Each structure stands twice: as structure tokens, then as C-alpha cells.
Regions:
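Active-site-adjacent structural elements that line small-molecule/cofactor binding pockets in enzymes
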Residues: 1-214
């Protein structure tokens, strides 16, 4: 909306520009002519050091977007707010799309998770709950969950919102809840969010040693 791109043209433009970025990273002279972009023998003066290019991770929340991630990127970046059962089904979609594109499993399969460690689950819920719940209430008002399955609305009581979605508890609790992501799905790059809007920094710092030393 901010760039006045009609909804019906956004995906096509995204795909077009992603391919252009990759060409600019790897080709000496790039020419392109479309409705929204004209390039005539353009060359990037400063190119990425990584060869052939930096890996591209595409986040995706629904089947078509996950298929696009398999087709156009080096890895599907798994979101932090889908429930475990949904991710299990989406992994099937992703793997099928990889096979259809004659691509092997990615070297890195990243996931982001909302995680907070404390001495036990009740304490973690009590401490992190107000900040994490507030964040997802805002997401719900923005309509961010409209791309999610109907039963995964963010407009739920916190106890229901957490189930199968966020990792809150003791280090042992967190470890047990994270295990399926690497044992079953092969995810090998974990990005953690443990500090949310309004949370004093010292509270997040209390969680971090438990994650780094005991998780």
C-alpha cells in the first residue's frame, strides 16, 4: 500500500525484482525492460563477496508462498507464529515443491521462534506473557494473521495463543519443544526472539544465560 502497488501485481513484481537482484549480483551487464523497470547495460560497481551470491531466504506463511520459496530461494525461512502441526504440513508442501523444481534440500533451513526461559513454565508465562501477548494483539489488529489458517488467529487468549507456537518454560521445557524442529524437519539455523516491545532489557538478559548455558 505504501508504494501504491495494486495487490494483483505485487507477487509478479516481487518475483521480477528478485530475479533482477540476482542478475545484478552475478552478471557484468544487465538489461531489462518491463512495465515498471528499465535497465540498459547496468553493472553493479560493488558486488557481494559470496559466490555465486549471498543465500536468499524467503519467508512464507501459506502454500503458494512456500512453493515460491522452494522455487526461487535458497531456503524457506520458517516463521515464528505458525503452530507445530501447520509447520509439519507446510514442510510437506515445501519438500514437494523442491522435488518439482529438481532441487535438493537446502544446506541451511532457518526458523525464527519466540522463546523465553525461566525457572519453570509458569514463571516464563507470567514474565513474558504481557509483552508477547501485546505484540500479537497488535498483529491481530493489523490483520497479519489473515494469511494463516483459520484456526490460527492471533485473536485468542494467551494460553491458547501459546500452544504449539511459542517456546516458554524452563530450559528443559524449551529443549523438548524445540526438538521436533531439528529431529523431524531438519531445521539447523535457529533465530531467537526473547525481547519484545515494552520489556525492560534486564528481563531479556535474565532469559539469555539460561538459553545459552542450559538449553
Amino acid at each position: 500500500d505504501a508504494f501504491a502497488v495494486p495487490k494483483g501485481k505485487r507477487v509478479a513484481r516481487f518475483e521480477e525484482y528478485l530475479e533482477l537482484v540476482q542478475r545484478l549480483w552475478t552478471e557484468d551487464n544487465v538489461s531489462h525492460n518491463s512495465e515498471t523497470c528499465v535497465l540498459n547495460n547496468v553493472r553493479m560497481n560493488i558486488r557481494p563477496i559470496q559466490k555465486p551470491s549471498p543465500p536468499i531466504w524467503l519467508a512464507a506463511n501459506n502454500d503458494k508462498a512456500i512453493e515460491r520459496a522452494a522455487r526461487m530461494s535458497d531456503a524457506w525461512f520458517v516463521n515464528p507464529h505458525s503452530q507445530l502441526e501447520t509447520i509439519r504440513r507446510h514442510m510437506g508442501v515445501y519438500n514437494d515443491a523442491l522435488r518439482a523444481a529438481n532441487k535438493s534440500a537446502p544446506k541451511e533451513l532457518p526458523i525464527m521462534k519466540e522463546i523465553f526461559c525461566a525457572k519453570d513454565k509458569a514463571t516464563a508465562m507470567q514474565i513474558a506473557g504481557p509483552y508477547l501477548f501485546g505484540k500479537y494483539k497488535d498483529y491481530a489488529t493489523w490483520g497479519q494473521d489473515k494469511v494463516m489458517p483459520e484456526n490460527e488467529s492471533f485473536d485468542q487468549e494467551f494460553e491458547d495463543l501459546v500452544k504449539g507456537r511459542f517456546i516458554l518454560g524452563s530450559p528443559e521445557d524449551c529443549y523438548d519443544e524445540l526438538r521436533p524442529y531439528w529431529e523431524e524437519f531438519g531445521m539447523n539455523h535457529l533465530i531467537i526472539r526473547t525481547h519484545w516491545v515494552g520489556m525492560p532489557g534486564h528481563i531479556a538478559l535474565d532469559s539469555m544465560p539460561l538459553m545459552s548455558n542450559e538449553l
